């Protein structure tokens, strides 16, 4: 059962919590189910979806109150009692209605006789009329305003003339409703024109100046309209789509975000970008779940800029796994790390379960040192694909034990409580602070970002990823050997799974800070190639609205899972143009090996 709060409905039953949207300081909103009796499940559809108002048209015939717009449309069993009063009565008797509810009844037959019969019928429902949480609002054909006080206290009225008040009977008015078409021709797509917005805002403010809630009827019924009316302070959002409008408005808090943590973009010098010269170091940055829209949202929320978007060599990568159209991170990470497609859930193993040589193992034979940095646990699917060989990604203990024979010299991520022992057993020195990495004299060094799961930026993680990238590059460079470094911004994906726009944006901006460190390093180490991509896209993310000037983004989602869309690839440094075009995720491995001048396995 949905929690119910302050709901005064329109020809409707208002049942649901007053919902507030923190993003952009949205006011509380209520949703009105227009002509609810025409729904496949009158009352129940709106009630189950937590709507705050349910409209029922009523026509009196032969002492029966039919739920209908006109006498010619009467359906014998569809009465106000069967469709609305009886269900509401059952909910009250069951103790499920504890907050304010309003039933607004739109009279389609003659006002006074119809209202008289409504009062007679309501006498049979004392549990409703005596409830401090329930009152009834009369709309449509109404008696003269001077007669409002002749009706019981629980009977209120809908007022439709914002320019005048009914004198001493104003306390019997529950809300103000007007026809949207009298103020605008907007169809709910795009946005209101400046002139129309001025007219719309004027009538809303006029109604609010009386202390009454406000509703438009005949209003556009789209997502853009629902959001616009919420922002403008319309108290009841009019809809013929109870489920869709409720889902949209209820999720606005998680789908909208105003950024206040920025990344200063680094402008590359491009001196060695695209040049035909030797590559000594390779930095591969993987934004988990980092599709083009995730990147766009981060850019728009970051003063319309990012280090990533300074780059000139851009490609698109396909992400399908061997056994599924939509990959998981294990199969995607394996494809990037080994150049081979595999089944979902497999870590560094082929479709038959056989171990696949990964890039860190391959390069070790050619004198390279390698490192892994992630904001996931060190056994996360993407990072482990670069050192482990297990058929099942959930086998964290076995994955960690693969560190014993790995070719990794630098390891940074979460999970200290679970994995510190095996890390030390694998020959790693564990640094207390990230800055201690560069002073380490050990052959292998590890720093744990967190005892368990690495916290998100929204939950307090600071500049750990960028700092780890900077110190990690310094550590590898000090070894005086060519190196390969994989850096993962893992929690962009987590924001997608949670359908949380703010988490996507903050994690993507944080990832861009790591990109800045990599590009800056490449500018001072001319033989360094930087590649930035994703393992897959997460959530089917889109951006229906936003404001670049205020760093505000509204996101929308088609799923809580991964999708099969192509993801962007950016490259910087010698031979960066090799990464333009459209290709499979396995090609990242092959392109790197070829550019380094090695024959493959």
Segment roles from a protein language model:
Residues 23-271, 278, 295:
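Phosphate-group recognition and catalysis centered on beta-loop-alpha active-site segments
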Residues 26-29, 50, 98-102, 130-135, ...:
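Loop/turn elements at helix/coil->beta-strand transitions in domains of secreted/extracellular proteins
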Residues 433, 437-448, 468-490:
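Active-site regions of oxyanion-processing enzymes, predominantly non-cytosolic
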């Amino acid at each position: 059962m949905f929690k119910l709060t302050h709901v005064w409905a329109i020809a409707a039953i208002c049942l649901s919590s007053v919902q507030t949207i923190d993003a952009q300081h949205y006011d509380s909103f209520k949703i009105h189910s227009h002509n609810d009796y025409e729904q496949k499940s009158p009352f129940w559809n709106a009630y189950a979806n937590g709507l705050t108002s349910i409209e029922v048209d009523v026509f009196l015939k032969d002492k029966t109150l039919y739920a209908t717009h006109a006498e010619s449309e009467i359906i014998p069993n569809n009465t106000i009692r069967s469709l609305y009063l009886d269900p509401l009565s059952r909910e009250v008797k069951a103790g499920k209605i504890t907050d304010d509810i309003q039933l607004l009844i739109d009279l389609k037959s003659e006002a006074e006789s119809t209202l008289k019969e409504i009062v007679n019928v309501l006498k049979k429902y004392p549990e409703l009329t005596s409830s401090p949480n329930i009152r009834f609002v009369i709309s449509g054909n109404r008696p003269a305003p001077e007669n409002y006080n002749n009706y019981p206290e629980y009977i209120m009225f809908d007022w439709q003339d914002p320019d005048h008040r009914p004198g001493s009977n104003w306390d019997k008015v529950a809300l103000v409703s007007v026809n949207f078409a009298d103020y605008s021709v907007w169809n709910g797509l795009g946005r209101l024109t400046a002139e129309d917005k001025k007219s719309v805002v004027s009538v809303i403010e006029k109604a609010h100046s009386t202390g009454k809630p406000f509703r438009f009827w005949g209003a556009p019924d789209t997502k853009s309209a629902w959001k616009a009316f919420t922002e403008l302070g319309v108290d009841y959002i009019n809809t013929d789509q109870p489920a869709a409008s409720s889902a949209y408005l209820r999720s606005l808090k998680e789908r909208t975000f105003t950024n206040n943590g920025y990344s200063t973009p680094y402008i590359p010098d491009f001196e060695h970008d695209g040049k035909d010269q030797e590559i000594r170091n390779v930095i591969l940055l993987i934004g988990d779940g980092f599709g083009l829209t995730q990147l766009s949202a981060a850019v728009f929320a970051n003063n319309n800029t990012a280090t990533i978007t300074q780059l000139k060599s851009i490609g698109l990568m396909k992400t399908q796994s061997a056994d599924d159209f939509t990959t998981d991170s294990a199969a995607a990470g394996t494809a990037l790390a080994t150049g081979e497609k595999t089944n979902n859930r497999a870590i560094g193993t082929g479709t038959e379960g056989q171990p696949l040589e990964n890039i860190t193992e391959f390069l070790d034979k050619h004198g390279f040192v390698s490192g892994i940095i992630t904001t996931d646990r060190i056994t996360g699917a993407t990072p482990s694909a670069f050192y482990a060989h297990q058929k099942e990604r959930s086998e964290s203990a076995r994955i960690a034990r693969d560190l014993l024979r790995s070719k990794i010299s630098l390891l940074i991520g979460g999970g200290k409580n679970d994995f510190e022992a095996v890390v030390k057993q694998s020959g790693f020195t564990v640094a207390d602070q990230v800055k201690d990495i560069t002073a380490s004299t050990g052959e292998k060094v590890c720093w744990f970002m967190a005892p368990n799961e690495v916290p998100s930026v929204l939950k307090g993680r600071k500049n750990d990823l960028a700092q780890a990238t900077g110190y990690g590059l310094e550590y590898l460079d000090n070894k005086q050997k060519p190196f390969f470094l994989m850096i993962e911004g893992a929690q962009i994906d987590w924001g997608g799974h949670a359908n949380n726009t703010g988490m996507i944006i903050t994690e993507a901006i944080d990832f861009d800070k790591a990109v800045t460190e990599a590009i800056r390093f490449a500018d001072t180490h001319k033989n360094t190639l930087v590649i930035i991509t994703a393992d897959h896209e997460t959530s089917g993310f889109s951006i229906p609205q936003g404001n670049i000037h205020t760093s505000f983004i509204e996101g929308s989602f088609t799923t809580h899972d991964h999708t099969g869309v192509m993801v962007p690839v950016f490259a910087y440094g010698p031979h960066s143009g090799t990464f333009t075009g459209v290709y499979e995720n396995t090609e990242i491995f092959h392109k790197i090996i070829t550019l380094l001048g090695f024959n493959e396995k």
